[in-house]
Amino acid sequence: MKILISPSKTQNKNIDSFSNNEENILFTNKTNELNDLLIKSINNEKFNSWLELKNNSLIEETIKDIKEFKNNKAYKAIEFYDGLQFKNILYSQLSETQKTKLNESLIIISGFYGIVFPNSYIKPYRLMLGSKINIPNYKNLYDFWFKEFNQKLEELNPDKLIINLASGEYSKLIDNSIFNVINVDFKLFKSNKYVSLSTFSKQCRGYFINQFLNINLDINKIKDLDILGFKFNNELSYKNNYIFTKAY
């Protein structure tokens, strides 16, 4: 079984867990190919929109990271990604046994690296899977990654069971014809209807992982979890879609 999540745009370079080289990376050649393409694309008028760069500081930092990619430091992924989802995994509070289980079970889907493990060492990047960047011989980044990503995921996951916590953007990369995918979602009951709110969803995805580790990744106990007040909703859930809800 593997747990799949999206990466975070927010990244933290001010951490102690870094290396001079990438580690535990599966698709080095494809990542280098993408960075070479980004270098060639810097002067393209669409470059900023491709990478969702909205201020001069971020533009300058991103271009610097791209140009100096080969010499940049690499950071431990589980600490480097710094968004709400990752904060709510509460990694520093996990036992060593739980950290080992996390490394064995969690996969972070990346538009730049393809597959990232919690203990992978990765370099700063900005390329998201939904980017519209032009890639020679491919329709888009989904097309660029789809075959190799799913082949490797199948190798890593022989029982083909996936707990999917990834966003819609990243879930598109998973070949549902190969895997038995359980999608987990969180909805608030607000104004007489159930809605998904990004902030709550990100927090809950991270905390779900924390709590899943607390029950030793027992798939049969998922429905009993309390995720920041969100509880399994039997009426809204269907087939392999597990919906957790709470009142706003």
Swiss-Prot record:
**Superkingdom of this entry's organism?**
Bacteria
One of this protein's GO BP terms?
response to hydroperoxide
Pfam families associated with the record: H2O2_YaaD
Task: Name a GO CC annotation attached to this entry.
Answer: cytosol
Q: Which family does it belong to?
A: Belongs to the UPF0246 family.
PANTHER family from the entry?
PEROXIDE STRESS RESISTANCE PROTEIN YAAA, PEROXIDE STRESS RESPONSE PROTEIN YAAA
**Per its record, how is this protein called by name?**
UPF0246 protein MYPE6270
- Could you tell me which species this protein originates from? Malacoplasma penetrans (strain HF-2)
